[in-house]
């Protein structure tokens, strides 16, 4: 049975609502680093543009947004799993860090935890300093992450992995991570 765009959008909204109830730490972690994960490319010394790749259906959240720029690429233009035949959507905040937090992407909401599938197929959440082009103090300083944040993030990603496209993407990223480093920390 094909899911409608409206049903997909409602599913994403429910995920957003769950993740809105938890935070990695008990304070605004952006105060530790100047919100580097939101404003990284606003520093003129950086040539990379900070964009986030969206998960399938997440692009529907940005239809009416003036604060985010939504664009897409053909899946053949970048290294993505072969199962992704359609366009890959990307989003960029137009005025970081002053974006509409109510529609920030799942990757922002679950940061700094990263989904990872081990070589034997087990699902984990990991912390990986090499994953980002900037330093996150939570990872660097080995700060304790709230248990409820870990639990909800794990449950959300576990559910998202039931989508074969999401599974293939996380699996590909996990294999790339395993080739790049073994120095990531399994959180759960």
Language model region names:
Residues 1-188:
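Short loop/turn segments that flank or connect secondary-structure elements
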């Amino acid at each position: 049975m094909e899911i409608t765009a409206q049903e997909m959008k409602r599913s994403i909204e429910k995920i957003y609502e769950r993740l809105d109830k938890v935070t990695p730490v008990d304070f605004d972690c952006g105060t530790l680093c100047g919100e580097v994960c939101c404003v990284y490319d606003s520093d003129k010394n950086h040539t990379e543009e900070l964009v986030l790749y969206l998960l399938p259906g997440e692009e529907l959240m940005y239809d009416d947004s003036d604060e985010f720029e939504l664009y897409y690429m053909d899946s053949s233009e970048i290294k993505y799993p072969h199962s992704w035949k359609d366009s890959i959507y990307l989003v960029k905040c137009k005025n970081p860090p002053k974006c509409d937090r109510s529609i920030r992407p799942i990757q922002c909401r679950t940061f700094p935890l990263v989904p990872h599938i081990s070589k034997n197929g087990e699902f984990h959440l990991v912390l990986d300093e090499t994953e980002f082009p900037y330093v996150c103090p939570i990872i660097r300083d080995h700060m304790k992450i709230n248990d409820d944040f870990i639990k909800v993030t794990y449950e959300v990603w576990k559910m998202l992995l039931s989508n074969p496209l999401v599974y293939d993407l996380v699996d590909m990223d996990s294999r790339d991570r395993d080739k790049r480093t073994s120095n990531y920390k399994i959180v759960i």
